[in-house]
Regions:
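Glycine-rich, charged/polar anion/phosphate-binding loops
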Residues: 113-119, 135-140, 166-170, 184-190
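Short, structured patches in soluble enzyme cores that scaffold and shape functional sites
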Residues: 102-104, 111, 118, 125-129, ...
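Structural signature of FAD isoalloxazine-binding scaffolds in flavoprotein oxidoreductases
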Residues: 92-110, 123-125, 260-271
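Catalytic-pocket segment enriched in acidic/His residues
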Residues: 5, 9-10, 46-50, 57-64, ...
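N-terminal accessory regions of nucleic-acid-interacting proteins
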Residues: 138-152
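N-terminal non-catalytic cap/leader segment that marks the start of a structured domain
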Residues: 1-97, 266
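Well-ordered beta-strand scaffold positions
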Residues: 20-21, 105, 208, 272
């Protein structure tokens, strides 16, 4: 299944994508939230659709898409998880996953604008594969970690490099501004992705290809990440793990290049859809 959410900010409704159409699932009576995943929501939704899908109203594709999941308890990001990205950042390849949090208030829809923060000079892009947790996970082993995964999303881990690297490194500070976590368009359930470790991911700025790689280049794979993180915190249903970005970010270019007011970002991952975001100065929206 491909889950989506749609509607004006603060009044989003649940839906699905089916055969190229967006369908309103409001009649199901639940949003795609922690409670939904916690209570076997995907299985219940699939069963409900068997007898109700023909009744669902089609959504006009001019409608705003929101994040495909309701605000989760956590957005956990993994740093330097592609070897060439570590090299372009001038940092050694990590021996264990580098973890940091991204404020959930940064979450937004896949076509919402990127807001360049006040006093920002180095707002950057990062295409990433995001993993959505399907059930509570604590101290789990790598061998069964995939049992805890609900599905996958496309994520732009927007970053402000000056904020991030200031005073020796404050990653959460450089990752958590408003609209710094465009997610979606869809949550694609794991049964639809045959091999999440062989997906092309790419990103363009103003039509120019900046990132073009494959998840086969991940330093730490998804089972390793899910298991590792669960040793240090409880993962709740709906939590997002963003698995890192490949090379081609603005920071690594010579000279570096960053987003300016009016720039357009387009990104995609095989099977997960395409997103587009336009950058705006914070005080010009």
């Amino acid at each position: 299944m491909k889950l989506l959410r749609f509607g004006k900010n603060g009044n989003e409704k649940p839906g699905i994508e089916l055969e190229g159409k967006w369908l309103d699932c409001s009649a199901f009576g639940e949003d795609w939230s922690e409670e939904f995943f916690e209570n076997n929501g995907l299985e219940r939704l699939e069963k409900w659709l068997e007898t109700n899908v023909h009744k669902l109203q089609e959504i006009n594709k001019k409608t705003r898409l929101a994040s495909p999941i309701k605000r989760p308890s956590k957005i956990i990001c993994v740093g330097l998880n592609y070897s060439l990205h570590a090299k372009e950042s001038g940092m050694p390849l990590p021996e264990v996953p580098i973890l940091f949090m991204k404020a959930t208030s940064s979450l937004c829809g896949p076509y919402d604008p990127i807001l360049i923060p006040k006093n920002s000079t180095k707002t950057d892009w990062e295409v990433e594969l995001a993993v959505v947790i399907g059930k509570k996970a604590s101290y789990i082993g790598k061998e069964n970690a995939m049992d805890y995964v609900a599905g996958y999303c496309l994520h732009n881990d927007v970053s402000e490099r000056d904020f991030q690297l200031h005073h020796g490194g404050q990653w959460v500070k450089g990752k958590s501004a408003d609209h710094f976590a465009p997610l979606g368009p869809y949550l694609v359930t794991k049964d639809e992705i045959i091999n999440p470790h062989n997906l092309r991911l790419w990103l363009k700025v103003n039509g120019q290809m900046m990132q073009d790689s494959n998840t086969s280049d991940l330093v730490f794979d998804i089972p390793t990440l899910v298991s590792y993180i669960s040793q240090y915190m409880t993962l709740l249903p709906g939590d997002v793990i963003s698995t890192g970005t490949p090379s081609g970010v603005g920071l690594g270019l010579k000279p570096p290049r960053y987003l300016s007011h009016g720039d357009e970002v387009e990104l995609g991952i095989d099977g997960l859809g395409v997103a587009k975001q336009k950058a705006y100065d914070y005080d010009k929206v």
